[in-house]
């Protein structure tokens, strides 16, 4: 049966087409898909052109296949079963066949960026996230429709209790009940959107959309040519510049007056060719920033610029930029392949994105993409374009600036807007520098211009869907943050707990407080996304605290927010879960610090501790460096230690937010056409003083952030100690992720009261040793100041410490560390007998021992830093000169002082040990005589004489006395004879004549022989006696 469509629906669509405003329809019911054909038909008649294109987004499955052949078979089966009305079936299939429908999975929604559709259909509401909602709605052109299909809902309030797919990521082992605050706020916000209609599957408008009850046709202010005022101004600008080359042809490619003026401003800077000139272009999403930059770069090529570089977080962000560079070339009558070539990347990570354009019409010119951290390639640059600068870390953006022309663009709101406070910090600094006189310093005296685009390309200004989406997702909150009325002393400020039920209730005052709080987070140095809002609203473990000054209750106004802290409760993980995670090598969502601690130290007890992780801490941009952040951290620490309110003994009865309350209690008792949805009235207070709420029982507070020197020093100042630094830096920010802990005073843990780190001390020492060993490889490029802050070495030792008696950790021996030869080389270096190359290996050894606090030698900060750079990071002297701004001679002088101090201590500890270990020659012991020299000579002479006598007697030979031998007969005769008076006897010889009278010559030779031997014997005896 045919039914007349409510005229207000048709009027809303036609008004949107006339004003180039988008309209939104929320259809509730199982047959909501059938009404899409009717809405598409009404839109086609209103736009008076070809059928509007359709984007159909879904989770994982379509009711009717997007494949033509499969769809025909599927529709045939449904027709045979009688499950579809043939008339409706034919209309729907006709829409799919000729309606230019693009189907897209939610997980693949990034590929639709930059495309424009006339109608967007969103089904499977449970899979939607704030990011997906913003990303898909932004693709709809002015006059188009956004259709949200909600099936299987018995009432509108059942949307508040719907379980979303993203809730699985919010649940942890100790916090398993996710809330539906975001959906409740989403539902209530639909009533405030003037271009949104909520209806059932029969196109009956529900009471929630009572605001369109009196909708009427709107007149359009157009001239005889059918142009609006903005369109007339743009036409006039194009006509005025039509004769100017090359800006005239480029202006014809602009779609809005703002975009045209931006191109003219860019081209003025190009022709000026002033050094250190910066033009900044800021706008919300969809204003044509990248297109304006592309046209301006095409004009720079025509003006003769040769080296043009473009940088962005990823080449994917430059698709529109390079597209409009080529369109600019077409307008200037450049021909591809004849005048220029487009080069695509071969890197698979860049997905064949355009990275270079080579131009060779006039002379060789290049438009080249570089990554943000490659600033060293800018030596020959003439024009640098920085697109999406807000997504690049602020220090990196500053390093890219130099003595050349810079075009800078950034999204300051919308779902791509980031919270790097680019417009509040960098642009403010550039503006101040441009006003200051040139002093010769870097960055001074630069020319700075700022352009802001307000008119959207896709839809007309004042689009109600854009306003609704910005308010729902807190996207355009830059104007919602007023300056504090005063800056009270941090000691006078108090920390308050924020009740999230009241915060997301869509009450007027609560909504204003939420917008200001999110504006404060966006203006801080954190990168934000719309998904963070849903996490903040629905995650059961997350809590909010705000620091406020003294509140005057007599004034009925919202107090100024000085600081916001977002806290996530973690821990209470069973030991079985921890063991399972170690075995599988996979950590579940949430509980970042417990899982990372368990992974790093293989400790299964720590995940059972309960703790709180500070997700973010954001201070008002006009109250920075005033102590409010430190005051908030101190108050939060005291609160969780039970110093402000007593800690609850029964943890299950902690007064957290109340359980989610239904928007209307009688919703299930009335029909959908009679259901009234309004904000709750019986809400608890938004702000709760800490002394009125019992804190959870915790063992520690932790924090995780991108490692920078200022942030690390802030947390170390509050006694947080690191236990993890990621070895691989972030591809987006270039920062290493760092996690720190601060143990809280707890009666359940037995620790040494004098140790401020408590149970965490041994883990912290182990981390420092591991970090020092990684400095030569993974953290070699880390700034020495940051490395010194992470290690936090003790460099000032008292005299009692230097003696080694106050600590058992000091070196007592050099066994296994330095050999005696090493000590000799070190001594030679300290005495200037050799150069540093001879002791470079010793420097690395001593550096590790010193930073492990085993050498109690007091050094200055600069001396310790040089030891760290050379010994731990193993950098060269040129790098140290560049980082520390010191001359090489100064570095060598300081290094020599370090070596002398270390050698002095080592020599005192193990000096005797070193001497005993060195090899040496054997020494002889000489003793004095007990007698005088004269007595010694006389005694020696006496000995010689006695020896000579003895040798003389023994020297007589038998052969020499043979001639005097008496034979036997002669002896017998002598016995019988008498001796004469003369004493001579005569004996008869028995030998022959020759025998008795041997040869005279023989006698003579024997005589000479005896005489010579006798003389030799005497002379040898004399020499022997002299020696003795």
UniProtKB/Swiss-Prot annotation:
Ligase: is it a keyword of this entry? Answer: no
The record ties this protein, via InterPro entries, to: GNAT_dom (IPR000182), NAT10 (IPR033688), NAT10/TcmA_helicase (IPR007807), P-loop_NTPase (IPR027417), TmcA/NAT10/Kre33 (IPR032672), TmcA_N (IPR013562), tRNA_bind_dom (IPR027992)
GO CC annotation terms, alphabetical? nucleolus
**Binding residue positions for acetyl-CoA:** 617-619, 624-630, 717
User: Where are the residues of the annotated region Disordered?
Assistant: 982-1028
Provide ranges: composition bias, Basic residues.
1018-1028
Could you tell me where the Basic and acidic residues compositional bias lies? 990-1001
Q: Answer whether the UniProt record assigns the keyword Acyltransferase to this protein.
A: yes
- Write out the annotated subcellular location: Nucleus, Nucleolus
Q: What is its EC number?
A: 2.3.1.-
The UniProt entry lists the main location of this chain as: nucleus
Locate the N-acetyltransferase domain: which residues? 546-729
- GO-annotated biological processes: rRNA acetylation involved in maturation of SSU-rRNA; tRNA acetylation
Q: Which Gene3D superfamilies match?
A: 3.40.50.11040, 3.40.630.30, P-loop containing nucleotide triphosphate hydrolases
Enumerate the catalysed reactions.
Answer: a cytidine in 18S rRNA + acetyl-CoA + ATP + H2O = an N(4)-acetylcytidine in 18S rRNA + ADP + phosphate + CoA + H(+); a cytidine in tRNA + acetyl-CoA + ATP + H2O = an N(4)-acetylcytidine in tRNA + ADP + phosphate + CoA + H(+)
Give the top-rank taxon of the lineage listed in the UniProt record for this protein: Eukaryota
Keywords, alphabetical: Acyltransferase, ATP-binding, Nucleotide-binding, Nucleus, rRNA processing, Transferase, tRNA processing
Q: Where does ATP bind?
A: 286-295, 458
EC primary class? transferase
Query: What are this entry's molecular-function GO terms?
Result: 18S rRNA cytidine N-acetyltransferase activity; ATP binding; tRNA N4-acetyltransferase activity
Query: Which PANTHER family does the record match to this protein?
Result: N-ACETYLTRANSFERASE 10, RNA CYTIDINE ACETYLTRANSFERASE 2
Function according to Swiss-Prot or TrEMBL? RNA cytidine acetyltransferase with specificity toward both 18S rRNA and tRNAs. Catalyzes the formation of N(4)-acetylcytidine (ac4C) in 18S rRNA. Required for early nucleolar cleavages of precursor rRNA at sites A0, A1 and A2 during 18S rRNA synthesis. Catalyzes the formation of ac4C in serine and leucine tRNAs. Requires a tRNA-binding adapter protein for full tRNA acetyltransferase activity but not for 18S rRNA acetylation.
Give the family per the record: Belongs to the RNA cytidine acetyltransferase family. NAT10 subfamily.
Q: What is this protein called?
A: RNA cytidine acetyltransferase 2
């Amino acid at each position: 049966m045919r039914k007349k469509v409510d005229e207000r629906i048709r009027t809303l669509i036609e008004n949107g087409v006339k004003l180039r405003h988008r309209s939104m329809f929320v259809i509730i019911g199982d047959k909501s898909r059938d009404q899409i054909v009717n809405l598409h038909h009404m839109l086609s008649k209103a736009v008076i052109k070809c059928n509007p294109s359709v984007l159909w987004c879904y989770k994982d499955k379509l009711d009717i296949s997007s494949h033509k052949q499969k769809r025909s078979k599927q529709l045939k089966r449904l027709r045979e079963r009688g499950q579809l009305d043939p008339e409706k079936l034919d209309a729907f299939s006709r829409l799919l066949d000729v309606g230019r429908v693009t189907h897209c999975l939610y997980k693949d929604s990034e590929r639709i960026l930059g495309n424009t559709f006339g109608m967007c259909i969103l089904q499977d509401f449970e899979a939607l996230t704030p990011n997906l909602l913003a990303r898909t709605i932004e693709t709809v052109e002015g006059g188009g429709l956004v259709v949200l299909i909600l099936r299987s809902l018995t009432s509108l309030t059942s949307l508040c209790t719907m379980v979303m797919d993203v809730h699985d990521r919010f649940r942890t082992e100790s916090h398993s009940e996710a809330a539906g605050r975001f959906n409740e706020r989403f539902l209530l916000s639909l009533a405030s959107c003037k271009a949104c209609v909520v209806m059932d599957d029969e196109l009956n408008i529900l009471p929630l959309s009572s605001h369109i009850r009196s909708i009427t046709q709107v007149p359009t202010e157009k001239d005889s040519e059918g142009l609006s005022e903005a369109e007339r101004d743009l036409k006039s600008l194009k006509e005025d510049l039509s004769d100017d080359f090359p800006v005239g042809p480029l202006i014809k490619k602009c779609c809005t007056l703002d975009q045209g003026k931006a191109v003219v401003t860019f081209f003025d800077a190009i022709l000026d060719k002033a050094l250190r000139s910066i033009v900044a272009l800021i706008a919300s999403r969809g204003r044509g920033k990248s297109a304006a930059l592309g046209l301006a770069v095409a004009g720079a090529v025509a003006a003769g610029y040769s080296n043009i570089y473009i940088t962005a977080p990823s080449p994917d962000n430059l698709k529109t930029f390079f597209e409009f560079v080529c369109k600019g070339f077409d307008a200037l009558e450049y021909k591809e392949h004849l005048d220029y070539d487009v080069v695509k990347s071969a890197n698979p990570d860049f997905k064949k994105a355009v990275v270079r354009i080579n131009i060779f019409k006039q002379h060789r010119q290049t438009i080249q993409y570089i990554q943000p951290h490659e600033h060293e390639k800018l030596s020959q640059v003439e024009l640098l374009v920085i697109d999406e600068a807000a997504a690049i870390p602020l220090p990196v953006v500053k390093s890219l600036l130099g003595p050349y022309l810079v075009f800078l663009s950034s999204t300051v709101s919308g779902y791509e807007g980031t919270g790097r406070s680019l417009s509040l910090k960098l642009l403010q600094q550039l503006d101040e520098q441009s006003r200051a006189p040139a002093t010769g310093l870097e960055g001074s005296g630069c020319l700075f211009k700022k352009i802001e685009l307000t008119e959207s390309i896709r839809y007309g200004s004042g689009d109600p869907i854009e306003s609704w989406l910005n308010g729902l997702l807190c996207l355009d909150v830059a104007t919602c943050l007023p300056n504090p009325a005063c800056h009270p002393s941090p000691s006078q400020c108090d920390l308050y707990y924020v009740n999230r039920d009241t915060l997301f209730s869509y009450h007027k005052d609560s909504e204003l407080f939420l917008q200001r709080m999110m504006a404060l987070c966006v203006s801080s140095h954190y990168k934000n996304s719309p998904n963070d809002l849903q996490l903040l609203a629905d995650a059961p473990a997350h809590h909010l605290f705000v620091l406020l000054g003294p509140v005057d209750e007599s004034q009925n106004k919202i107090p100024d927010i000085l600081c916001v802290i977002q806290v996530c409760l973690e821990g209470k993980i069973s030991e079985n879960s921890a063991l399972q995670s170690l075995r599988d090598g996979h950590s579940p969502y949430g509980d970042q610090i417990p899982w990372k601690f368990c992974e790093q130290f293989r400790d299964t007890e720590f995940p059972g501790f309960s703790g709180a992780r500070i997700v973010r801490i954001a201070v008002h941009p006009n109250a920075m460096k005033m102590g409010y952040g430190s005051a908030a951290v101190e108050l939060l620490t005291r609160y969780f230690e039970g110093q402000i309110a007593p800690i609850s003994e029964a943890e299950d009865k902690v007064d957290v937010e109340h359980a989610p309350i239904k928007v209307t209690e009688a919703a299930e008792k009335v029909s959908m056409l009679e259901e009234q949805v309004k904000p709750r009235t019986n809400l608890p207070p938004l702000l709760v003083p800490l002394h009125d709420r019992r804190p959870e029982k915790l063992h520690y507070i932790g924090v995780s952030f991108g490692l920078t020197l200022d942030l690390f020093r802030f947390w170390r100042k509050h006694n947080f100690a690191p236990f993890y630094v990621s070895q691989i830096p972030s591809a987006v920010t270039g920062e290493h992720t760092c996690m720190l802990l601060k143990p809280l005073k707890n009666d359940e843990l037995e620790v040494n009261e004098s140790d401020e780190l408590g149970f965490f001390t041994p883990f912290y020492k182990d981390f420092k040793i591991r970090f020092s060993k990684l400095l030569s490889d993974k953290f070699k490029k880390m700034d020495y100041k940051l490395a010194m802050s992470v290690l936090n070495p003790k460099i000032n030792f008292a005299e009692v410490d230097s003696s080694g008696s106050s600590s058992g950790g000091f070196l007592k021996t050099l066994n296994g560390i330095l050999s005696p030869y090493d000590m000799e080389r070190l001594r030679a270096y300290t005495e200037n007998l050799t150069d540093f190359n001879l002791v470079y290996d010793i420097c690395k050894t001593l550096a590790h021992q010193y930073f492990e606090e085993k050498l109690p030698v007091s050094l200055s900060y600069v001396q310790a830093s040089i030891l760290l750079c050379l010994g731990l990071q193993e950098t060269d002297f040129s790098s140290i000169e560049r980082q520390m701004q010191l001359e090489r001679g100064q570095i060598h002088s300081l290094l020599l002082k370090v070596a002398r101090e270390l050698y002095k201590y080592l020599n005192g500890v193990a000096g005797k040990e070193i001497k005993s270990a060195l090899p040496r020659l054997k020494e002889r012991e000489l003793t004095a005589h007990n007698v005088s020299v004269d007595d010694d000579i006389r005694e020696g002479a006496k000995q010689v004489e006695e020896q000579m006598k003895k040798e003389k007697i023994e020297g007589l030979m038998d052969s020499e006395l043979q001639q005097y031998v008496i034979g036997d007969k002669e002896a017998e005769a002598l016995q019988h004879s008498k001796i004469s008076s003369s004493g001579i006897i005569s004996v008869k010889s028995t030998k022959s004549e020759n025998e008795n009278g041997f040869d005279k010559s023989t006698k003579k030779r024997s005589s000479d022989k005896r005489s010579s031997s006798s003389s030799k014997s005497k002379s040898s005896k004399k020499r022997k006696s002299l020696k003795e």
